[in-house]
């Protein structure tokens, strides 16, 4: 099997390399692609030094079975035809094709069969916040249909890229030295702050990030589920957290929910409030699963349930999910 990584020098591209190394897929050849800035760099994979090739409109993808792409929506749109025209299946981490009717949007724990129906040979990876939420929601959906969801996200700096992480560290150092903090990657200072603004605002005053959770959840779950999201950037380096409230068709008890989560694929239950056992990004960064805790009945609605979930958005929220899609196809 011949695999390509497009955008290998980015945070998700580097995670692709690590995950492919860890999971020992039957890869005969791995080809790395990048921009002019990245071309010529070398990375080690399974003991070999691999040189990054410049991504160009040519026949470099001929003979490649799967391409894992994470180079931004603009690059994905520009190069999709180049990547797929010789039969390569493109598993794309960007937002470019997620809502296209003829492109499946896949989370393997939820809708793996959708990956097998990709007429354009493009499969889209959902947004990181959607991925971790639907993995958890699937456990409850299997018990009783979910009518609606309210979710507030607590998204780490790394969700905005490596430069954003560096800026957060710089801000803390500058403030500690009594200096004015550098603000470039975020709308405001993130250190000692939270910012209820991720991506641009739309006409309905929700951000694009929030509307992604609405549209993507419905597509992945093949459901009329209603989703209202508030997405917030928090001064955490890695791993996203979500506070989720949902309403089901019939009441679901806490014990039922715990049992469902404990059996769900891709979920780890951490739910012992009395023992201070609950998921936190400090301990979840670098892990593969969606961690669920703080499960409780809603006090205002008989059919309401609330929980808290945390997941590493670079692994399960991006690179790992794409590799799992690949694994469903081989």
Regions found by a protein language model. Name each.
Residues 67, 157-330:
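Charged docking surfaces used in two-component/phosphorelay signaling
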Residues 1-190, 226, 290-291, 295-300, ...:
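N-terminal Rossmann-like NAD(P) cofactor-binding subdomain of oxidoreductases
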């Amino acid at each position: 099997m011949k695999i390509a990584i497009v955008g290998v020098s980015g945070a998700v591209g580097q995670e692709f390399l690590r995950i492919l190394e860890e999971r020992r897929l039957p890869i005969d050849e791995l080809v790395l692609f990048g921009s002019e800035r990245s071309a010529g760099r070398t990375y080690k994979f399974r003991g070999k030094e691999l040189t990054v090739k410049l991504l160009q409109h040519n026949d470099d993808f001929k003979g490649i079975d799967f391409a894992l792409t994470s180079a931004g929506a603009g690059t994905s749109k520009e190069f999709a035809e180049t990547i797929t025209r010789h039969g390569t299946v493109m598993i794309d981490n960007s937002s470019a094709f997620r809502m296209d009717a003829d492109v499946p949007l896949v989370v393997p724990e939820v809708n793996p069969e959708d990956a097998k129906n990709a007429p354009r040979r493009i499969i889209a990876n959902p947004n990181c916040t959607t991925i971790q939420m639907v993995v958890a929601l699937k456990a409850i959906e299997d018990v009783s249909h979910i009518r609606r969801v309210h979710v507030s996200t607590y998204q780490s700096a790394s969700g905005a890229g490596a430069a954003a992480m560096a800026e957060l560290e710089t801000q803390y150092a500058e403030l500690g030295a009594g200096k004015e903090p550098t603000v470039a990657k975020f709308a405001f200072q993130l250190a000692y702050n939270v910012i209820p603004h991720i991506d641009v605002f739309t006409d309905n005053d929700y951000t694009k990030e929030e509307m992604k959770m609405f549209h993507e959840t419905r597509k992945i779950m093949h459901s009329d589920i209603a989703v209202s999201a508030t997405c917030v950037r928090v001064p955490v380096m890695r791993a996203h957290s979500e506070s989720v409230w949902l309403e089901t068709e019939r009441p679901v008890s806490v014990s039922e929910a715990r049992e469902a989560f404990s059996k769900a694929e891709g979920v780890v239950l951490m739910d012992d409030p009395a023992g201070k056992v609950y998921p936190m990004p400090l301990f979840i960064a670098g892990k593969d699963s969606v961690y669920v805790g703080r499960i409780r009945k809603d006090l205002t609605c008989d059919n309401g349930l609330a929980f808290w979930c945390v997941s590493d958005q670079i692994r399960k929220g991006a690179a790992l999910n794409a590799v799992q899609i690949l694994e469903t196809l081989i």
